[in-house]
C-alpha cells in the first residue's frame, strides 16, 4: 500500500533514484495505491546528467509493492521494496530500461511497454 509521503525506489534508467509519493490518482479521497496504480511523485535523489532532475514532479506507476496483493486464483504476490516506473504525459515510460521484476497486474492495466521492457514478469 502506497500513500502520500511514501518513499519509493525508481526501477528505470530515467535518472531518478528515489522519489516520494505526493498524490494517489483514482478519485477524490483515495488513500492507497497498489500494483499498477498511477501516483504523482516528486524526485528526491537523481544521478547527475540524467533526464530527470531533483525536485521535479512527475507521474509514475507502481511496479513492486511490499504489501501483499491477493490474486484471483487465491495466491498472493509480495515484493521486498516499493518501486515505481516514471511516466511521461502520454503514460509511457520515461526510461528505456526497467530494472528488476514487475507484477503481472501491469499487463491487466494495459502497461504493455513496461511489461515488454521488464526482464521478468511475476
From Swiss-Prot:
<dbReference type="Pfam" id="PF00238">
    <property type="entry name" value="Ribosomal_L14"/>
</dbReference>
<keyword id="KW-0687">Ribonucleoprotein</keyword>
<keyword id="KW-0689">Ribosomal protein</keyword>
<dbReference type="GO" id="GO:0003735">
    <property type="term" value="F:structural constituent of ribosome"/>
</dbReference>
<dbReference type="InterPro" id="IPR005745">
    <property type="entry name" value="Ribosomal_uL14_bac-type"/>
</dbReference>
<keyword id="KW-0694">RNA-binding</keyword>
<comment type="similarity">
    <text>Belongs to the universal ribosomal protein uL14 family.</text>
</comment>
<comment type="subunit">
    <text>Part of the 50S ribosomal subunit. Forms a cluster with proteins L3 and L19. In the 70S ribosome, L14 and L19 interact and together make contacts with the 16S rRNA in bridges B5 and B8.</text>
</comment>
<dbReference type="GO" id="GO:0022625">
    <property type="term" value="C:cytosolic large ribosomal subunit"/>
</dbReference>
<keyword id="KW-0699">rRNA-binding</keyword>
<dbReference type="GO" id="GO:0006412">
    <property type="term" value="P:translation"/>
</dbReference>
<protein>
    <recommendedName>
        <fullName>Large ribosomal subunit protein uL14</fullName>
    </recommendedName>
</protein>
<dbReference type="InterPro" id="IPR000218">
    <property type="entry name" value="Ribosomal_uL14"/>
</dbReference>
<comment type="function">
    <text>Binds to 23S rRNA. Forms part of two intersubunit bridges in the 70S ribosome.</text>
</comment>
<dbReference type="GO" id="GO:0070180">
    <property type="term" value="F:large ribosomal subunit rRNA binding"/>
</dbReference>
<dbReference type="InterPro" id="IPR036853">
    <property type="entry name" value="Ribosomal_uL14_sf"/>
</dbReference>
<dbReference type="InterPro" id="IPR019972">
    <property type="entry name" value="Ribosomal_uL14_CS"/>
</dbReference>
Amino acid at each position: 500500500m502506497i500513500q502520500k509521503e511514501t518513499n519509493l525506489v525508481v526501477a528505470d534508467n530515467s535518472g531518478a533514484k528515489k522519489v516520494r509519493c505526493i498524490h494517489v490518482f483514482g478519485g477524490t479521497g483515495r488513500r492507497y495505491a497498489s500494483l499498477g496504480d498511477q501516483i504523482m511523485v516528486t524526485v528526491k535523489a537523481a544521478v547527475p546528467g540524467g533526464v530527470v532532475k531533483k525536485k521535479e514532479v512527475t507521474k509514475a506507476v507502481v511496479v513492486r509493492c511490499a504489501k501483499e496483493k491477493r490474486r484471483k486464483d487465491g495466491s498472493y504476490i509480495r515484493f521486498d521494496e516499493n518501486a515505481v516506473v516514471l511516466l511521461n504525459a502520454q503514460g509511457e515510460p520515461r526510461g528505456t530500461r526497467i530494472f528488476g521484476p514487475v507484477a503481472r497486474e501491469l499487463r491487466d492495466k494495459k502497461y504493455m511497454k513496461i511489461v515488454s521492457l521488464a526482464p521478468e514478469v511475476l
